[in-house]
């Protein structure tokens, strides 16, 4: 009997869904190596492997069988995905076109490392980013540039503005996945995209206000307010938007700063200068990468206090998702300082969830940890922090937490789209 790889759901599923991996038709207690590989849109290769042993019936189920070593060890049913590593260093797995899936090739090889033997079976597994029926609508309204994703069922839906960080451009994959959970989500670009400013030297909150108003006026978005979701600089912008703008009910800040960073922020007659930077505080790792965690000045001292975002003006509810091993900046410190400022002014205490051994890029589930890559503002490779397994577990939990938070504070019902298509 030939060995067969069995996936459930078979064939394809949404990127944020777990897949059950099993092998049948092996010899009793046969040692095998499972290998996963994936190429991103630019052709960069990511790989992971793990050693296993079949049971007495010649079967192997990754939900029951621990990995004996390789890219990971122990009972990790999704390890072959979250443990993927780039063949070349400094490559972060990013999905730029959500209309096409990423294909993972899974292989079963006879024996164990260092030299597993012949290929026993292989299967191609597609993971898509546009859930079935989710509608994708490019947005060019006034100055606003982005993409709106709407669930398949009739609206209106709770609305969310979704923003990424200093890489600029427009990333849609988090918004498209979240639309599959019953939200109307607009991925918003704010610089280095189409006719938007090329740099972050000066950002005007009026632009973001226009985006919020666009979403609130959309016939398939229910008010009276919207949610904000942002990571890194995008998380910091969520704090600024909630502090200065009307129409914001709830905000999720993933590893954001409580100080304005990287450029001047303007709104009407007010200006927030960027917090000061001291490049002498850059450390260098043994791999030669920069560790910039101490580079920014404290927004609690001296002239840098002017960069502190006036969160006490915000009327929205906050959820801070914090990686305690974030090496981009001091995310836990920032979340705690925002909490202190809010409570000192009688505002509602925010929810803060801290994840140990978790780095800067807390992504949707099953994205592999990016250990280091080029930082757009620093101009050289930096480390982002995190340990692969802990970071992977944090991503699964954070994804659930932010959905629960938005459903609670924006209303709506928890919708999920069946995975089988």
Curated annotation (Swiss-Prot):
Domain of life where this protein originates: Eukaryota
Major subcellular site: cytoplasm
Gene Ontology cellular component annotations, sorted alphabetically: cytosol; mitochondrion
GO molecular function: carboxylic ester hydrolase activity; fatty acyl-CoA hydrolase activity
Annotated localization: Cytoplasm, Cytosol
Entry keywords, A to Z: Cytoplasm, Fatty acid metabolism, Hydrolase, Lipid metabolism, Serine esterase
Active site residues of this protein: 232 (charge relay system), 326 (charge relay system), 360 (charge relay system)
EC number(s) reported in the record: 3.1.2.-, 3.1.2.2
UniProt catalytic activity: hexadecanoyl-CoA + H2O = hexadecanoate + CoA + H(+); decanoyl-CoA + H2O = decanoate + CoA + H(+); dodecanoyl-CoA + H2O = dodecanoate + CoA + H(+); tetradecanoyl-CoA + H2O = tetradecanoate + CoA + H(+)
Listed Pfam families: BAAT_C, Bile_Hydr_Trans
Family: Belongs to the C/M/P thioester hydrolase family.
Quaternary data: Monomer.
Name the UniProt record assigns to this protein: Acyl-coenzyme A thioesterase 1
Organism: Homo sapiens
């Amino acid at each position: 009997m030939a060995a067969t790889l069995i996936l459930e759901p078979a064939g394809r599923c949404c990127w944020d869904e777990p897949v059950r991996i099993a092998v049948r038709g092996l010899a009793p207690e046969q040692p095998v190596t499972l290998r996963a590989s994936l190429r991103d849109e630019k052709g960069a290769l990511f790989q992971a492997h793990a050693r296993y042993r079949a049971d007495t019936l010649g079967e192997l189920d990754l939900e029951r069988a621990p990995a004996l070593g390789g890219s990971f060890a122990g009972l990790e049913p999704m390890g072959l995905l979250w443990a993927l590593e780039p063949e070349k260093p400094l490559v972060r797995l990013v999905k730029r076109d959500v209309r096409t899936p990423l294909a993972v090739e899974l292989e079963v090889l006879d024996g164990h490392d260092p030299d597993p033997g012949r290929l026993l079976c292989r299967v191609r597994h597609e993971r898509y980013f546009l859930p079935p029926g989710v509608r994708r609508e490019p947005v060019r309204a006034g100055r606003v540039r982005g993409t709106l994703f709407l669930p398949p069922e009739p609206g209106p839906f709770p609305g969310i503005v979704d923003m990424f960080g200093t890489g600029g451009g427009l990333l849609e994959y988090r918004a498209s996945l979240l639309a599959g959970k019953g939200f109307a989500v607009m991925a918003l670009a704010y610089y280095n995209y189409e006719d938007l400013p090329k740099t972050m030297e000066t950002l005007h909150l009026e632009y973001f206000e226009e985006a919020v108003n666009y979403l609130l006026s959309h016939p398939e978005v229910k008010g009276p307010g919207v949610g904000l979701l942002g990571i890194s600089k995008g998380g910091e912008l969520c704090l600024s938007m909630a502090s200065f703008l009307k129409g914001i009910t709830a905000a999720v800040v993933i590893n954001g700063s409580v100080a304005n960073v990287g450029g001047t922020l303007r709104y009407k007659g007010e200006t927030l200068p960027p917090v000061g930077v001291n490049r002498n505080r850059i450390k260098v790792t043994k791999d030669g990468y920069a560790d910039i965690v101490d580079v920014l000045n404290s927004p609690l001292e001296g002239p840098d206090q002017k960069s502190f975002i006036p969160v006490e003006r915000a009327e929205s509810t906050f959820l801070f998702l914090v990686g305690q091993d974030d090496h981009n900046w001091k995310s836990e410190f920032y979340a705690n300082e925002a909490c202190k400022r809010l409570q000192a002014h009688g505002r509602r205490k925010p929810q803060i969830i801290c994840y140990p051994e978790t780095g800067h890029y807390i992504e949707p589930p099953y994205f592999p940890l990016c250990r280091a890559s080029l930082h757009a503002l620093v101009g050289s490779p930096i480390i982002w922090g995190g340990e692969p397994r802990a970071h992977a577990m944090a991503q699964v939990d954070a994804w659930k937490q932010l959905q629960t938070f938005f459903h609670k504070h924006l209303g709506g019902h928890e919708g999920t789209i069946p995975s089988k298509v």
